[in-house]
């Protein structure tokens, strides 16, 4: 009995620490990018996945202690996927006491009709969803649209653009929407996916899978995701260092002449951003920048995180 109590206490301690870390990361991102302001009405896009559930949960928690007043409204787009459990999200949101709206649009049928079997559906599906969500934000009077992309999504996008698009371009934490009418924010920008996974398991969210995304195992994004996860296992701290690099860009030491005016450098110019060692090899830190091992994380002993996903028939 005492042993069981001890285990429960340790689990609660670890959960509290995890929740505090997520709150801290979300709060820091909101502050760094001025994501939420006094009087904002934030439309939280809720897909039924672990990321959007966690985003709504943490935003609700921060709302209670924030020095500013803002409101939240959860929005789910019912894309009419066969077997989609329409009762799950309303029941969950009613229980949480969250204002919400379910938008019904048959984007699933449109995508299936237009995209040939075996081809990637993400681009069209995303474009359709985006237009519907922008329209809904206008109807609801939302001043911000919150999406559930996290730190790992941002890094994956960076590598996708480098490997396939020839660009150093990631996923911005805050941006103006395509139609020029809405501000889109990503409050989970500083949050690790593995933290979100553990939090979702502890919270026992009713996870709803996507029949479109989940049926495409060879997507380029999945390949990048697997690569980064392998790096994280083999070289602890590498992911944190790469994300730190995205926050410490030095345009004068890249090769984009549109971003930095190399032509203006003359013998009279000052040393820019520390100059360059030119003939000497730069000394690099022994430990990864931006990484600190979590004292509650014993990755060798902890079993893999498994989310309970609802079965769609």
Swiss-Prot record:
BP-aspect Gene Ontology terms: tRNA thio-modification
UniProt pathway: tRNA modification
GO molecular function list: 4 iron, 4 sulfur cluster binding; ATP binding; magnesium ion binding; sulfurtransferase activity; tRNA binding
Gene3D superfamilies: HUPs
Cofactor(s), by name: Mg(2+); [4Fe-4S] cluster
Compositional bias ranges of the Basic and acidic residues kind: 299-313
Reaction catalyzed: cytidine(32) in tRNA + S-sulfanyl-L-cysteinyl-[cysteine desulfurase] + AH2 + ATP = 2-thiocytidine(32) in tRNA + L-cysteinyl-[cysteine desulfurase] + A + AMP + diphosphate + H(+)
Disordered: annotated segments: 288-313
Extent of motif PP-loop motif: 47-52
Cofactor descriptive note: Binds 1 [4Fe-4S] cluster per subunit. The cluster is chelated by three Cys residues, the fourth Fe has a free coordination site that may bind a sulfur atom transferred from the persulfide of IscS.
Pfam families associated with the record: ATP_bind_3
Subcellular location(s) of the protein: Cytoplasm
GO cellular component, one term: cytosol
EC number: 2.8.1.-
Amino-acid positions noted as binding [4Fe-4S] cluster in the UniProt annotation, renumbered to this chain: 122, 125, 213
Keyword list, A-Z: 4Fe-4S, ATP-binding, Cytoplasm, Iron, Iron-sulfur, Magnesium, Metal-binding, Nucleotide-binding, RNA-binding, Transferase, tRNA processing, tRNA-binding
Subunit structure: Homodimer.
Note: The thiolation reaction likely consists of two steps: a first activation step by ATP to form an adenylated intermediate of the target base of tRNA, and a second nucleophilic substitution step of the sulfur (S) atom supplied by the hydrosulfide attached to the Fe-S cluster.
Record family assignment: Belongs to the TtcA family.
The protein's role, per its UniProt record: Catalyzes the ATP-dependent 2-thiolation of cytidine in position 32 of tRNA, to form 2-thiocytidine (s(2)C32). The sulfur atoms are provided by the cysteine/cysteine desulfurase (IscS) system.
Full protein name: tRNA-cytidine(32) 2-sulfurtransferase
Gene name tied to this protein: ttcA
